[in-house]
């Protein structure tokens, strides 16, 4: 009997001690990771995020969009893919792809020398200025026109990226000949000028070429995005192979480096440096390089950060990210050691009908708090809600024609609820 009593006392004491160790998680969020057992989810909060959630994350923001003034909307006039915005002598400058054709895009099979295949086909690079970032004055002629045939780019030049280096201005762009499209050869070319107002001169050679046969970017280099980091010119870009299929790379992002804006540029030996994304958006941030990654890949719709410009990690998950952002980032091309203060606003493009390749685009502005110098808590909210039309619009609602298919699948798949 005494032995039984002793065992009961030991078990009771063990249970008491165990319950004491498993204290409830407090209402006041601990700033340090607790030293008592917590769930895997709570451990991630401290190990990968921070106890203040998105409120305390400098690389988290919402994006608040505004229409721009000054860009007249006309039939078959498209504006898209803005560069970073720069400010020179009190004036903001931006360059962008613009298609001005007599016909809307018709796809690759039906395109002609005058009828575009895609929204960025038969395009030139245009320029606009502003004193406040909301109202813009567009030049009356293109800043950079397509080079003459048979030079690379005679079909279309598009998706420019601006670099300011040693007092000169460089516009990098993708150059298509003889046709645009996902399986058309596309290197990066560059034009240069002594002033943001031009005139611009085409450099005769391509400066970044697609990779070798069998590589991840063997057919095209798109969306060149220059950043100066550690006294080097880094040009980020989207790449893809000519081969298509579920087993192939769809699109990823890489980087090439140079000390000279006209090259040669050397690709990173660990390319691709981002495992997805569509249009590129990189800027100096907090001693490293930040990237806004959207639309494609397993880490889509995230902000990422790299200490060296090549090894990126997810820093936050974002909602309703901009398409083709071109941020105002005054230290994007700063030489020497710079900490990178981040961005508070940017231009981007929107397809009014929700399309992509075969519809026109407009430029828009968004404001955000991806900056070390401001603290806009309204832009740090993470509980965004939308009206009914947002859920039923094209691209989000169930596609037309699918109702019959869904009903047929339900007949085969939907079983009676299991009740014991």
What do the PLM-derived regions correspond to, one by one?
Residues 17-19:
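Sec/Tat signal peptide C-region and signal peptidase I cleavage site
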Residues 6-15:
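Bacterial N-terminal signal peptides
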Residues 21-420:
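Carbohydrate-active catalytic/glycan-binding domains of CAZyme proteins
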Residues 1-5:
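Bacterial N-terminal signal peptides that target proteins for export
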């Amino acid at each position: 009997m005494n032995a039984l009593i002793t065992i009961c006392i030991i078990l009771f004491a063990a249970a008491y001690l165990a319950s004491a160790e498993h204290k409830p998680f407090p209402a006041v969020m601990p700033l340090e990771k607790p030293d008592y057992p917590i769930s895997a989810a709570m451990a991630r909060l401290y190990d990968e995020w921070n106890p203040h959630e998105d409120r305390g994350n400098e690389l988290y923001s919402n994006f608040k969009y505004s229409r721009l003034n000054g860009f007249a909307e006309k039939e078959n006039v498209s504006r898209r893919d803005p560069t970073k915005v720069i400010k020179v002598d009190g004036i903001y400058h931006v360059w962008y792809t613009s298609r001005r054709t007599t016909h809307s895009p018709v796809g690759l099979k039906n395109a002609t020398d005058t009828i575009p295949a895609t929204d960025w086909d038969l395009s030139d690079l245009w320029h606009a200025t502003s004193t406040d970032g909301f109202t813009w004055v567009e030049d009356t002629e293109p800043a950079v026109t397509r080079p003459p045939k048979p030079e690379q780019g005679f079909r279309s030049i598009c998706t420019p990226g601006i670099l300011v280096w040693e007092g000169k201005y460089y516009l990098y762009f993708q150059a298509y000949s003889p046709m645009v499209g996902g399986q058309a050869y596309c290197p990066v070319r560059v034009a240069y000028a002594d002033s943001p107002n031009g005139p611009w001169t085409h450099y005769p050679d391509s400066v970044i070429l697609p990779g070798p046969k069998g590589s991840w970017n063997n057919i095209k280099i798109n969306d060149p995005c220059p950043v100066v980091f550690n006294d080097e010119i880094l040009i980020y870009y989207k790449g893809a192979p000519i081969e298509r299929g579920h087993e192939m790379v769809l699109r990823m992002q890489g980087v090439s480096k140079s000390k000279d804006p006209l090259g040669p540029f050397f690709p990173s030996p660990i390319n691709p440096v981002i495992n997805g994304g569509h249009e590129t958006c990189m800027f100096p941030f907090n001693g490293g390089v930040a990237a806004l990654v959207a639309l494609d890949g397993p880490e889509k719709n995230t902000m990422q950060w790299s200490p060296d410009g090549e090894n990126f990690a997810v820093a936050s998950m974002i909602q309703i990210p901009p398409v083709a952002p071109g941020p105002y980032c005054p230290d994007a091309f700063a030489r020497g050691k710079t900490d990178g203060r981040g961005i508070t606003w940017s231009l981007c493009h929107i397809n009014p009908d929700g399309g992509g390749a075969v519809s026109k685009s407009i430029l828009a502005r968004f404001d955000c708090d991806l900056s070390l110098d401001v603290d806009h808590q309204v832009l740090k909210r993470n509980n965004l809600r939308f009206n009914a039309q947002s859920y039923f619009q094209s691209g989000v609602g169930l596609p037309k024609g699918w109702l019959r298919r869904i009903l047929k699948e339900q007949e085969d798949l939907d079983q009676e609820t299991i009740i014991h």
